[in-house]
Curated annotation (Swiss-Prot):
Protein name as catalogued: Uncharacterized transporter Rv0917
Keyword Nucleus: no
UniProt cross-references to PANTHER family, sorted A to Z: HIGH-AFFINITY CHOLINE TRANSPORT PROTEIN, HIGH-AFFINITY CHOLINE TRANSPORT PROTEIN-RELATED
Positions of transmembrane segments: 21-41, 60-80, 97-117, 148-168, 204-224, 243-263, 275-295, 328-348, 359-379, 410-430, 457-477, 485-505
């Protein structure tokens, strides 16, 4: 046997050893089965999933609205309170990636492709058909202002707060408490290690894998449709099935090469290029379009978003039956929740060494501001053009696939900006595909941070094959059915996320209670504070001392020396640490007091 053959054999053995059969096999079977059903019975599957989605929207849409707002409150609480001082790693650990590289990767994976796909189409849609419950006439200036506020609302704090819940919890459990990087471990502080390692944990990871792969595959399919429609609109190609297959194959091959090279190489490199191209495209439109109008609109859109947020965030419109809320807000909240395992886990993977406050500030606030700027540049440009020229609609409707290219075609050097737009779409899809493949691979390997390359290739290729088969054989109906199925996974996963918020709160409070802080005090101060039964003094040495917040009933003050005897709070994780090369072990932060 040659060295190459032995190497290939070893790679296969390593891949088989790395997978977790209780997760890998059921997830693969469910994915393949649903693809087959969606292709063979495309119309039946589409109707069935549409009815399922209607039932979810009508029956539990209020739940999506409630929990999405709750996640915003949870994220802000963690960022503003003392919880924000906790580091996602050892107390002295530095971030793994630079701030800008980190921001580029999380933004590209999070919703970059959606910004390109809906940057023009969504504001136009709200302008053309605003929600009846708001009472704003269509095609008016008031409708334009409301359209931008609604668009930023759908892509702002609520979307990223959903990602924060999963990403923050997984980063904390992995880099601070030594758990595998897997969704199931979010529940350990509540359900215990035994259930997490059992059937419940397997089911959570399978749901996460299925939702992630279907979400990425359907996005790839719809994205290819947008690229093809745009190129055909510009008169550059005549689209047929071979063009579709070729584009999917090229994107899948690039994504596979990137995911094999790892996060610190391919993914980081592509994300940086992607953000540079996206920034160049936005700058082109800003400078070549109505610049002053767009800058004024951006400030107004931010103000409109802040002003309308209290009205939008808990609005269920029970007296309105136009279906707008289900088609837009509830759809988006379900879509973001279904993507939360993928995006949240990927953000966790690249956030080692950040503090919780830094994590939330960057993940929650920065993308919201960037999204508002992006939608202002493209959305307000389209609204102004439609208001003045009336040429952004096709037969009185918004064409999502060609609306971006229609806008660019009306600007100077439209051909150049259109080429740039195609490149941005392609790179956004590549970064979404390779990060999605990496996340799925980590989940199927039981949380191993660096799974074998062979399994990474398996998931990346499966995403591309799923998109190609669904698009070419089943058509748009199959893609819609599978996207609806992905959104349906949001209902059970939203319950997992609510439990995770409670579990993480318990773990964070223990961490604060068990981690020492340093203050400079004198002996008289300590004795006096001890006599007054203050909460924050735990030693009697003059100089720098270790202190922590404790409840008044958990310590005893010696009447003569002021020394404290403190009872340690119970650890919701039972202080179990995994000693493994694959996972990050938490440094023991407790000390004698």
């Amino acid at each position: 046997m040659s060295a190459k053959e032995r190497g290939d054999q070893n790679a296969v053995v390593d891949a088989l050893r790395s997978i977790q059969p209780a997760v890998f096999i059921p997830a693969s079977v469910v994915i393949v089965a649903m693809i087959v059903v969606s292709v063979v019975y495309s119309s039946v599957a589409e109707n069935a999933f549409v009815r399922l989605n209607s039932a979810i929207t009508g029956g539990v849409g209020w739940w999506y609205i409630l929990v999405a707002t709750g996640f915003v409150v949870f994220a802000l609480y963690c960022g503003i309170s003392r919880i924000g001082t906790i580091r996602l790693g050892r107390d002295d650990e530095l971030p793994e990636f630079s701030f800008w590289a980190w921001l580029a990767m999380l933004f590209s994976a999070g919703m970059g492709i959606g910004l390109v796909f809906y940057g023009v189409a969504e504001p136009l849609s709200h302008y053309l058909r605003p929600p009846r419950s708001r009472g704003v006439p269509a095609l008016t200036d008031a409708a334009a202002n409301q359209a931008m506020a609604l668009t930023v609302f759908h892509w702002g704090l609520h979307a990223w707060a959903i990602y924060v819940v999963v990403g923050l919890g997984m980063a904390y459990m992995t880099y601070r408490r030594g758990r595998p990087l897997s969704v199931r471990w979010l529940l350990e502080p509540v359900v215990g290690r035994g259930r997490v390692e059992g059937a419940l944990g397997h089911a959570v990871d399978v749901i996460a894998i299925v939702g992630t792969l279907f979400g990425v595959a359907t996005s790839l399919g719809f994205g290819i449709t947008q690229i093809a429609s745009g190129l055909e609109y510009l008169g550059w190609i005549r689209v047929d099935n071979w063009w579709m297959v070729g584009m999917i194959a090229a994107i899948t091959a690039t994504a596979t090469a990137s995911v094999v090279s790892g996060v610190s190489k391919g993914l980081k490199w592509l994300s940086n290029i992607n953000m540079a191209l996206a920034a160049a495209l936005a700058l082109f439109v800003l400078l070549l379009g109505p610049t002053l109008f767009l800058l004024q609109s951006w400030v107004q859109n931010l103000g409109g978003y802040v002003q309308s947020l209290p009205q939008f965030m808990l609005r269920t419109a029970p007296f309105s039956h136009d279906g707008w809320l289900g088609d837009w807000t509830i759809f988006y909240w379900g879509w973001w929740i279904s993507w939360a395992p993928f995006v949240g886990m990927f953000i966790a993977r690249i956030s080692r060494g950040r503090t919780i406050r830094e994590f939330i500030g960057a993940v929650l606030l920065v993308p919201t501001v960037i999204a508002s700027l992006w939608f202002t540049i493209f959305g307000d440009s389209a609204l102004l053009r439609q208001r003045n020229n009336g040429d952004m609609l096709v037969n009185g409707a918004v064409d999502t696939n060609t609306s971006l290219f229609r806008l660019l075609d009306g600007l100077p050097i439209g051909a150049i900006t259109s080429v740039l737009a195609v490149l941005v779409i392609v790179f956004f899809f590549v970064t979404s595909s390779d990060s999605g493949s990496l996340v799925i691979d980590i989940l199927s390997a039981g949380g191993e941070l660096d799974p074998p390359k062979l399994t990474r290739v398996y998931w990346a290729v499966l995403e591309g094959v799923a998109a190609a088969v669904l698009l070419l054989i089943g058509g748009a109906g199959s893609l819609t059915a599978l996207r609806t199925a992905a959104i349906a996974t949001a209902l059970p996963f939203s319950i997992v996320m609510v439990v995770a918020c409670y579990a993480m709160t318990k773990a964070f409070h223990f961490d604060l209670a068990a981690t020492p802080r340093l203050l400079h005090v004198t002996v008289p101060d300590v004795v006096a504070a001890g006599n007054r039964r203050r909460h924050d003094i735990s030693a009697t040495l003059s100089g720098l001392i270790a202190v922590r917040d404790v409840d008044s009933g958990t310590y005893i003050v010696h009447p003569d020396t002021g020394a404290l005897t403190v009872t340690a709070p119970p650890d919701p994780l039972d202080d179990h640490v995994f000693e493994s090369d694959r996972h990050v072990t938490r440094r023991n932060t407790t000390s004698s007091r």
